Structure formats: structure tokens, C-alpha cells
């Protein structure tokens, strides 16, 4: 515990000295001070990683002298969850934030030392300032190295809802996204301070922005999957305040990635780009603040704490400094060119940004409306999912339509007839698919438009690849597949973007179809009973009970039939974790602690069958009370036998179970679309190959 505190204090001192050295290095252009700053960045990184390693070792060794370990782990917690439990707590998540940011800062040291020497002092100074902020919080407000009360030998265990494999990765992905947004912000501040506001800083942050964007997207998708497979309500996005807070920086980062292309190519939107970078960083801080402040109710929040005030101060300082710097450098942020034509790729990018920022505003307003309404009227009123869906759906449809037409437009200006000729095949395909959807029973106009648009995007992207490959084949003599591979290899950013767009619209189409085609019911059944939902027959075959050291599971074995044919077997269950409340009795605490749902899902490309079970344990109340009275003092081995006997009674007596059965189309396409987005981002992040041989009629070097 003392060693961990010492590491944090040393890290804070190193960060503060590094900030001072960075400022002085900028003022004097002293390379020795800059070298000191670089070394201090690496020192902060090393100290942060050592602190994380120390905490991980404490979890693995069940060292309950650490309050964090005692409160969030136990001897029976599986190793995987011990390793990931570190960031399930407020203090541990701050340490994770610091580790991710410091590692990224070390990468900046490695890259900026050669390519961006003039920006480096301010960049490192900003990064170290943010590191110092998180170190200050851990030293003064929420230390991960607090000691447990004397004599603590038993841990409380990990919060049951977090015992889901993907949920352990969800915070890491989000924090890489949040911390990744700090790097573009640091470069933007450096560009504003130094007055070097060309495209060089954009080139420097391009990969960091893409990494942050990709991991924010991954975090959002992992959280959605957890909600769908674990929470027991049947949905994948509930417009929860903390979910929305993670979505906000992703939207502004998406806008920046697109608008930065215009500045690189045409020298336009300079004010807009630095504003988007600042907004993305501020919204990342807002997301981190919201989960810790307790000001809005959320299943994801840590609860009320004193950390809200420091975060509000930092957010206010960042916003004020950003506005002042942009206003100060406004003369240097004038665009080099004007928009040449409305029918151009620049115009599509601009409209894309307007819609993305509009979406961010709608989500921000809806998320913080309880606070706004309380401030104005004195009454806290929340806006539910229907409100969000009403106002976000038109903007989402607009994005799909822009993605459908964007690739077919040229930079600066496009002839109307040429554009129409280019869009003929994609639009015809989209209309045909829309007609098929209507014939299949899809009646929601927005769903038809999104699905139609998704196919137009797919067809437009495929057409762009085919045209580029055909041109390459004609000049090189290579076969078309080889030429296509060469084109993609040399233009990974472009075609990675196309693949990401395809994944995005596929995901949106899945969301639209899932929202328009859900049907289900709640039904109470006993073994032998059946229920029919949307063509499926779900038959309750028998109850299931399982006793493990860390939980007791009560569930059901269900047979799923369609058109007289057995499709699969599902085993939805409810898992009960022991309570530490001794007032519930020696045995009662095992059956009356926190419970989570294990969902039975039969997934397919067409539709999902989703089943949750809620067993009635009232029939076990009598044997539990009797065991509490008669066997409260028996040894642990005897307790285990009695608990197993009580659980077996559930199987023998087979009480009624309430099932929630939902059939929803399109859900699998959400995860497929997310996978395509990830593949597109990975392709765009890979550096293009140069000077490679193309297979064909003769070996030929691809010219630069």
C-alpha cells in the first residue's frame, strides 16, 4: 500500500516538473530541457505501469489488506475477473486512464522527436498536465492504494453484472478512446500556441484520432452487446446517460476525421477542426466526469463522489483556454480556399459534419435535460428513449444518404449528368432492395430508407473499387483481382474508409430493422408448458440448478421448435451471488444476494430468439429458514451439502418460472456491421505499400 502511494506521489512530482520543463523549453528553445521533458514523460509512464502492476499482483494474490481488493474481489473470483477487476472501481479506473494516457504520451515522444520538433514542447506539456491531473486525483481524492481495516480476510467479490467476458474489455476500449482524444487536443493547442496552423499538425494526429475513434466505437459496441446478453431487458441501447456520454466524443471525433481531410486537401475548415478536436477532448472529460459525479442516474455510474468538482474545474479550464486560443489565432485560421460548387465532395463532407454535430447536440440535450429542467423549473424531468429516437432518426437517415452519394462526387465540382450516370446502378440496386423489403412486410418508411441507403452505399463503394481496379488492370496488365488488391494496398486510407462506411450503414440498417420488427411476451410456465412467439415454439423441458463456490444458478432447459423441426436448446438462467449481510442467515445469504440474468439466445442472420428466465424461489423459503434455524453453526463442508440439497429441491419441486421471450430481426447485422467498421479502421490505419510488384503479364514496378 505504501509503495503504491509512493509511486503515485513520485509520478505527480515528475509530471509537474515535466510541465515546467516543457514550458521553459518552448520559451527558450532549449533542446536540453526538451530532452528532460521527454525523459520525465517516460518516467511518468514507468511509474504508472508499476503502480498498475502492483495492484494487479495484489488482486491475483488475494491481498485483502488493499481496500480495493477487499471491496471488489474474493478468493473464489476467477483469475480473469481478478485481473480485470482493477478498473471496475472508481480509483482503479483513474489509474487505467493514467496508464493509457502515459503510454500514448510515450509514443508521442517517440514520434514527435523527429517529425514535429517545433510542436513537441507544448504537446508534451499538455499531456503531462492531464497526467498530473489524474495523479492529483489519486493522491488526494480516490487512491487505489487505501488500506483495509485491520483484520480484513474476506473479499466482497466482483459486482455480478461485471462478470461478463466482454464487459472486462469494454472499459479498456473506452479509456483508450478517451485518452486517445487527449493527443489530438495537445497537438491542436501546440499549433495554436506556436501559430503553425497548416496541415502538419493534422498529419501528426491522424493516426491517434483514428485509434481513439476506433476504440470508442469498440467500447460502445461491447457495451451494447453486454446490455443485450446480460441485463435481461432485451435491448442493446437504452439511451442511458453514461452510454450517451461515451457516444458524444465518438460523434465529434467522426466529424473531425472527415473535416480534417478537407483542410489537408483544400486548406478549409481550420477553425472548425480545432474546435472539433477541443470538443472531443472536453466530451471525453464529460464522459469520465458523468460516471463519477452521480448527478444523473445510470446503471453504469460509480455513484456520488467528491470527484465531480475537480472534473468540472478541468472542463471549465479546457473550454475557456480553447475558446481564448481560437479567438486569439482567428486571423491565422482563415480558409485558403472557398467552396467551389454545391455538387462536390467538400459539400458532402460539410453536410456530414453538420449532421454529426447535430446528433451530438441532440444526444447532449437529451442526456442533460434533467439538470436543465431542474435549473429552469425546479423539477427534474428525464427524456426517455422515444424522444431520442424521434430526433436522432432523421439525422441518421441523412447520414446514410450522404454516405450513399459521397463517393461518386469529385473534389471541387461535379457535372450533374456525370453524377447521375455514376449513380444509376447503385440507386437501381437500392430501389430494388427497398421494393423487396416492402414486399416482405417492412412498412416503416424510415427502415425502408435506411436499408435502401445501405445497399446504395455498398454498391457505390464496390463500384469505386471496380473502376479503380479496372484502370489499374488496363495500365499494368494485371488480372482484375490482383489489380484490386494492389489498388487497396496502395490506397488503404481511402478504401478503409469505404469499408468503414459500409459497416456503419449495415449496423444502422440492423438497428432500424431490429427496432421495427420486435415482438415478444412475458409468460409463466411449468415443465411441459409451451409458448409460441413469431413462428417459434418454446417448450419448457425441465428445471436446472447448479451450485458453485461463487454462485448458485437456477434456470431452465428449453427446446426451440419452428415448423415442426427442433432448432436448438436454450438454457436461460438466473445466477445468485452470496450476500455479505449476515442478517439474512447462514444459508439465506446464498439465495438472497445480487442476481444476474444469463440469457438464452438463438442468433441467426435473419432474426434472434432471446429468452430470459426469472425463477420463483418462494418455494425454497421454508427450507432456507429451517436451515438457518437448525444448522447455522455447522462446518463449511456441511453447509455446502445443505446448500446443494436446498438447490436440488428446486429441481424436484419445479416451481413456476416467468420467461421473457423476444423475437427480433436484424440484430446480428449490428454486430456484423461493427466488425466491418473495425476491419475498415484497421485497414485505414495500416501504412500503404510502395514500390511493390504487380502480378500480370509482365513484372512491373508500381510507380509512385
Model-derived features: positions:
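Solvent-exposed, non-transmembrane regions of integral membrane proteins
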Residues: 1-704
Amino acid at each position: 500500500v505504501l509503495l503504491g502511494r509512493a509511486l503515485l506521489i513520485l509520478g505527480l512530482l515528475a509530471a509537474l516538473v515535466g510541465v515546467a520543463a516543457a514550458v521553459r523549453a518552448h520559451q527558450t528553445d532549449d533542446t536540453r530541457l526538451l530532452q528532460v521533458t521527454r525523459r520525465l514523460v517516460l518516467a511518468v509512464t514507468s511509474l504508472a505501469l508499476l503502480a498498475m502492476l502492483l495492484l494487479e499482483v495484489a488482486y491475483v494474490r488475494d491481498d485483502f489488506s488493499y481496500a480495493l481488493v477487499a471491496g471488489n474481489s474474493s478468493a473464489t473470483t476467477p483469475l480473469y475477473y481478478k485481473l480485470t477487476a482493477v478498473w471496475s472501481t472508481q480509483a482503479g479506473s483513474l489509474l487505467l486512464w493514467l496508464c493509457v494516457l502515459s503510454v500514448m504520451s510515450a509514443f508521442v515522444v517517440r514520434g514527435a522527436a523527429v517529425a514535429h520538433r517545433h510542436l513537441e514542447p507544448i504537446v508534451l506539456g499538455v499531456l503531462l498536465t492531464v497526467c498530473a491531473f489524474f495523479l492529483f486525483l489519486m493522491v488526494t481524492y480516490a487512491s487505489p492504494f487505501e488500506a483495509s481495516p485491520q483484520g480484513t480476510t474476506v473479499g466482497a467479490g466482483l459486482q455480478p453484472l461485471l462478470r461478463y467476458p466482454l464487459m472486462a474489455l469494454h472499459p479498456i476500449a473506452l479509456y483508450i478512446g478517451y485518452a486517445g482524444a487527449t493527443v489530438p487536443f495537445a497537438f491542436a493547442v501546440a499549433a495554436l500556441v506556436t501559430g503553425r496552423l497548416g496541415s502538419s499538425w493534422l498529419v501528426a494526429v491522424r493516426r491517434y484520432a483514428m485509434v481513439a475513434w476506433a476504440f470508442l466505437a469498440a467500447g460502445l459496441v461491447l457495451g451494447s452487446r453486454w446490455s443485450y446478453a446480460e441485463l435481461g431487458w432485451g435491448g442493446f441501447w437504452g439511451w442511458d446517460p453514461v452510454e450517451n456520454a461515451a457516444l458524444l466524443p465518438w460523434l465529434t471525433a467522426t466529424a473531425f476525421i472527415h473535416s480534417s481531410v478537407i483542410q489537408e486537401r483544400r486548406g478549409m475548415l481550420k477553425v472548425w477542426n480545432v474546435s472539433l478536436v477541443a470538443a472531443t477532448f472536453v466530451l471525453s472529460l464529460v464522459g469520465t466526469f458523468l460516471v463519477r459525479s452521480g448527478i444523473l442516474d445510470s446503471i453504469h455510474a460509480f455513484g456520488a463522489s467528491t470527484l465531480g468538482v475537480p472534473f468540472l474545474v478541468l472542463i471549465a479550464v479546457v473550454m475557456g483556454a480553447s475558446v481564448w486560443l481560437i479567438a486569439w489565432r482567428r486571423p491565422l485560421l482563415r480558409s485558403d480556399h472557398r467552396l467551389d460548387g454545391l455538387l462536390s465532395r467538400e459539400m458532402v463532407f460539410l453536410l456530414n459534419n453538420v449532421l454529426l454535430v447535430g446528433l451530438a447536440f441532440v444526444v447532449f440535450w437529451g442526456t442533460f435535460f434533467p439538470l436543465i429542467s431542474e435549473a429552469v423549473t425546479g423539477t427534474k424531468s428525464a427524456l426517455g428513449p422515444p424522444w431520442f429516437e424521434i430526433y436522432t432518426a432523421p439525422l441518421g437517415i441523412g447520414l446514410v444518404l450522404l454516405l450513399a452519394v459521397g463517393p461518386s462526387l469529385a473534389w471541387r465540382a461535379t457535372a450533374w449528368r456525370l453524377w447521375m450516370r455514376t449513380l444509376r446502378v447503385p440507386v437501381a440496386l437500392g430501389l430494388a432492395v427497398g421494393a423487396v423489403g416492402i414486399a416482405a412486410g417492412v412498412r416503416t418508411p424510415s427502415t425502408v430508407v435506411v436499408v435502401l441507403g445501405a445497399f446504395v452505399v455498398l454498391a457505390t463503394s464496390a463500384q469505386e473499387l471496380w473502376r479503380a481496379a479496372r484502370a489499374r488492370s488496363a495500365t499494368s496488365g494485371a488480372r482484375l483481382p490482383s489489380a484490386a488488391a494492389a489498388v487497396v494496398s496502395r490506397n488503404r486510407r481511402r478504401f478503409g474508409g469505404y469499408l468503414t462506411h459500409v459497416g456503419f450503414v449495415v449496423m444502422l440498417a440492423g438497428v432500424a430493422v431490429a427496432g421495427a420488427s420486435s415482438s415478444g411476451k412475458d409468460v409463466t410456465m411449468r415443465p411441459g408448458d409451451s409458448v409460441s412467439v413469431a413462428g417459434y415454439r418454446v417448450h419448457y423441458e425441465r428445471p436446472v440448478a447448479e451450485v458453485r463456490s461463487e454462485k448458485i444458478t437456477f434456470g431452465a432447459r428449453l427446446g426451440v421448435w419452428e415448423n415442426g423441426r427442433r432448432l436448438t436448446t436454450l438454457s436461460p438462467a438466473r445466477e445468485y451471488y452470496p450476500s455479505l449481510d449476515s442478517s439474512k442467515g447462514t444459508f439465506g445469504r446464498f439465495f438472497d444476494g445480487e442476481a444476474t440474468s444469463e440469457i438464452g439466445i438463438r442468433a441467426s442472420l435473419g432474426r434472434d430468439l432471446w429468452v430470459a428466465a426469472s425463477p420463483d424461489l418462494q418455494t425454497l423459503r421454508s427450507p432456507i429458514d429451517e436451515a438457518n434455524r437448525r444448522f447455522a453453526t455447522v462446518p463449511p463442508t456441511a453447509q455446502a451439502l445443505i446448500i446443494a440439497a436446498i438447490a436440488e429441491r428446486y429441481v424436484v419441486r419445479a416451481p413456476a418460472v416467468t420467461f421473457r421471450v423476444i423475437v427480433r430481426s436484424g440484430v446480428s447485422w449490428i454486430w456484423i456491421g461493427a466488425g466491418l467498421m473495425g476491419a475498415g479502421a484497421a485497414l485505414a490505419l495500416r501504412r500503404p505499400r510502395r514500390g511493390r510488384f504487380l502480378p500480370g503479364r509482365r513484372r512491373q514496378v508500381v510507380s509512385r
